A protein has these predicted regions:
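Rossmann-like NAD(P)H-binding beta-loop-alpha module
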Residues: 59-140, 147
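Catalytic, metal-anchored helix/loop core of enzyme active sites in primary metabolism
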Residues: 92-94, 102-105, 121, 126-131, ...
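Substrate-binding/catalytic subdomain of NAD(P)-dependent oxidoreductase enzymes
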Residues: 117-215, 220-222
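A conserved regulatory-domain signal marking ACT and ACT-like small-molecule sensing domains
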Residues: 248, 253-370
Length: 370
């Protein structure tokens, strides 16, 4: 045994990096790869940020990087994308990839509790960190989404073009309203091919409550992958925790040993470059359906003004729900739209917010009809 990482790199056949962070961990991995040593890592933040550099070094030296534990913990999604689904062109991936967020949203719905109350409980139970921002602001999920997208499409996209939005603005009222409309709110990683480009985005999303992903509750994770031959596949399990991580790490070590025994000519690489798609589509150019909620004056003609604004941006309405007024002069209005570009929706919302009869800024949540 040694406490010197460089000594371990020199003497060990396989390097397992579990120290975390993006500085010292990067040094360890690069030094190991330069010496032709295979690496196993669970470091999602490092791979999301420096994956292109690390795998370029691995290709140069003929070494391998295995990283099953970086996405989905004990769910074998990396191996499935790399091997089991290799005969498919991946059309889309939907993922519930953060147990903390999924636990919070599940408890808010089940116990009719607000966000801050459930977050405090999650911290007491060890499901959330003392500083939970990486989880609840969506960046943990975004790291995982970037890795999965890069593997699926053969190009390291990095974090910069990925749209990230967390769950901190989700209210109990919205969870109740969307449930009445037949939806559940999940923090969803969305990866899609789109006319030569790729969508990689993370945000709260309304999904039909009868869908398989809507039934994934508490700290569990799930990934739905659609391939052109296989259709929809679903991977479900524990996405974090020492046992789930250990399971994935040991599986990677086993694959490394198989590669070492097979020899370099028959090894299975950890990443194969394909460059099938050019770039990540900006969020403003993404087409989606939307849920809009707002408070308006209980006066004739208000809805007509709102629908006229939406129509001027070619946004058509799927349904409108007006909640019964309980005292006061305002009513709650919920609008579901058909597909439209996000830039058009944002422009329409600016004009709707400027109406004298609108009492609060419009809140919107994207919808995915899985």
């Amino acid at each position: 045994l040694t406490t010197d990482a460089m000594e371990a790199i020199e003497t060990c056949q396989v390097i397992v990096e579990l120290v975390g962070g993006t500085t010292f961990a990067k040094t360890i991995i690069l030094e190991a790869l330069k010496r032709g040593k295979p690496v196993v890592t669970a470091n999602k933040a490092l791979l999301a940020k420096y994956g292109e550099e690390l795998f370029a070094e691995a290709e140069k030296s003929g070494a391998d990087i295995f990283y099953e534990a970086s996405v989905g913990g004990g769910i074998p999604i990396i191996k499935s994308l790399r091997e089991g689904l290799v005969g498919n062109r991946i059309n889309r991936i939907y993922g519930i990839l953060n147990g903390t967020c999924n636990y919070i949203l599940t408890r808010m719905e089940r116990d009719q509790a607000d966000f801050k109350e459930v977050l405090a409980d999650a911290q007491k139970l060890g499901y959330a960190e003392a500083n939970p921002s990486l989880d609840i602001d969506g960046f943990d999920t975004a790291h995982k989404a970037t890795i999965a997208a890069s593997l699926a499409y053969g190009k390291w996209f990095g974090m910069d073009p990925v749209y990230v939005e967390g769950i901190t603005e989700i209210t109990l009222d919205e969870i109740k309203l969307t449930k009445e409309l037949g939806y559940k709110i999940k923090l969803l990683a969305i990866i899609k091919q789109n006319d030569g480009n790729v969508e990689i985005r993370v945000h709260p999303t309304l999904i039909p409550k009868q869908s398989m992903l809507a039934k994934v509750d508490d700290v569990f994770n799930a990934v739905m992958v659609n391939g052109d031959f296989v259709g929809d596949t679903l991977f479900y399990g524990r996405g974090a925790g020492r046992n789930a991580t250990a399971s994935a790490v040991v599986a990677d070590i086993t694959d490394v040993c198989l590669n070492l025994n097979a020899g370099s000519s028959r090894r299975l690489p950890g990443f194969v470059a394909g460059n099938l798609y050019d770039q990540v589509l900006p969020i403003d150019n993404v087409r989606s359906r939307y849920y809009l909620s707002l408070q308006v004056a209980d006066e004739p003609g208000v809805l007509a003004k709102i629908t006229n604004i939406l129509a001027s941006y070619n946004i058509s309405i799927s349904s409108v729900v007006q909640k019964e007024r309980k005292g006061g002069e305002n009513v709650s209005l919920v609008i579901l739209t058909h597909l439209c570009e996000e830039k058009d929706m944002k422009a329409a919302i600016v004009r709707i917010n400027a109406l004298e009869e609108v009492r609060n800024n419009v809140k919107f949540i994207r919808i995915e009809d899985l």
